[in-house]
Structure formats: structure tokens, C-alpha cells
């Protein structure tokens, strides 16, 4: 793990300094997430990425803007301490308070491994979770993707068969836009993309998001 103690030392930058049109809805900086509370390590709702990934994401955002769309980010760089908090939450089988919203069809004991990992590519600073906003007709609104972010369910798989044709087309729109700039999708989560090649594939960071 990197000894860096600040985002600047780690080489992490706020993506909105490059693309202010990106909408930020950092779920783990508030209680609107599967743990039901602010996640350790998130002191502010900022999207940090290593510069190569941030610059690539800015290019995606600029291209989508010309077509009337905006990116909406839910998570970007994730401190290691946050990953540990997720693992601890998944191991606490007594806490089922968010099951109806986030994992109604999956047993919580199945989340660890399949959906929540003990290490995360997010901690390496080149992975982002996001969706699309449609701004073509005035006020922006979220593009329907078939599930919400962090919905632990097979329907969140990018190629899930039990979503509508319109929802599938929306997922493919996002997939194509991200792929052009080198982002690879994680097939179990339509929202999850990693910039390739990763700038620091062997290094995780634990600096706070502040």
C-alpha cells in the first residue's frame, strides 16, 4: 500500500477540475448507500482519480456533452479503510436494514466474495462507478438502466437478460462511450469501469477523500 497521506501525494486529482460538467453523487460520502451510513474515509463528496484516468474520463464527459448527456459519478477512488468497512458490514448478518433496497433477492451471506471483495480496484485510483444523465430536453434526468447503483442482484449484470430493450440500449450507450477512452466494464455491474492500462496496478491508496 502506498505511504501517501494526502490525495496530492498519491497523485489523485478531482475530476471536476478537468470536467466540471460531470455530476457528482458520491454515495459513500452520505448515508444513501447499502451500509446506510457515511463510509469511513469519505470526508467530502469528491471524485478523485489518478491523472491518466481522470483525463480519460474528462474526454468521455466532453464527448457525451456534445450529444446532450452528462456523466453522473457514484464512486471513484475508494480508500482501503472504506473497503475494510464494507467487508465488516457484509460479515454482520444481523444488520439487514438495507436489504429491501439493495439486495432483496440475495442472502447477505452471499454478498462477500460475489459482490463485495476484500480488496478493490477502486483503491488503485483508476476505477469509477457511474451512470448517465439525459440533458437533451432541458432539465437533466437519470437515464433508466434497469437497476439503481449498488443493487446486488443478477439484474445489475451488464448483459442481464431480464431488463427492457431500452434499458439494455442505455447500458450499451454508456459502455461504448467509456470503451472509446480505454475504460473496461466489470460484467457483474453495469456502472463499474476501470481505465486500462491501470497507472499503478500494484498499488492501493488509503488517503481520505476530502
Identify the function of each model-found stretch.
Residues 1-76, 80-188, 197-210:
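Extracytoplasmic cell-surface/polysaccharide-interacting catalytic and binding patches
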Residues 193:
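Conserved metal-phosphate-binding beta-hairpin within the catalytic cores
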Amino acid at each position: 500500500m502506498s505511504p501517501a497521506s494526502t490525495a496530492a501525494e498519491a497523485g489523485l486529482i478531482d475530476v471536476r477540475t478537468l470536467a466540471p460538467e460531470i455530476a457528482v453523487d458520491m454515495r459513500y460520502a452520505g448515508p444513501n448507500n447499502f451500509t446506510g451510513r457515511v463510509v469511513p474515509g469519505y470526508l467530502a463528496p469528491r471524485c478523485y482519480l489518478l491523472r491518466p484516468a481522470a483525463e480519460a474520463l474528462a474526454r468521455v464527459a466532453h464527448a457525451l456533452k456534445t450529444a446532450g448527456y452528462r456523466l453522473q459519478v457514484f464512486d471513484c477512488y475508494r480508500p482501503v479503510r472504506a473497503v475494510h468497512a464494507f467487508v465488516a458490514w457484509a460479515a454482520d448478518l444481523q444488520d439487514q436494514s438495507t436489504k429491501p433496497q439493495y439486495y432483496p433477492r440475495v442472502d447477505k451471506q452471499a454478498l462477500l466474495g460475489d459482490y463485495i471483495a476484500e480488496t478493490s480496484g477502486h483503491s488503485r485510483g483508476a476505477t469509477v462507478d457511474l451512470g448517465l444523465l439525459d440533458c437533451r430536453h432541458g432539465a437533466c434526468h437519470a437515464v433508466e438502466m434497469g437497476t439503481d447503483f449498488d443493487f446486488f442482484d443478477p439484474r445489475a449484470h451488464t448483459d442481464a437478460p431480464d431488463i427492457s430493450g431500452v434499458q439494455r440500449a442505455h447500458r450499451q450507450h454508456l459502455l461504448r462511450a467509456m470503451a472509446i477512452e480505454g475504460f473496461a466494464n466489470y460484467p457483474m455491474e453495469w456502472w463499474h469501469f476501470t481505465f486500462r492500462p491501470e497507472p499503478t496496478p500494484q498499488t492501493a491508496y488509503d488517503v481520505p477523500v476530502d
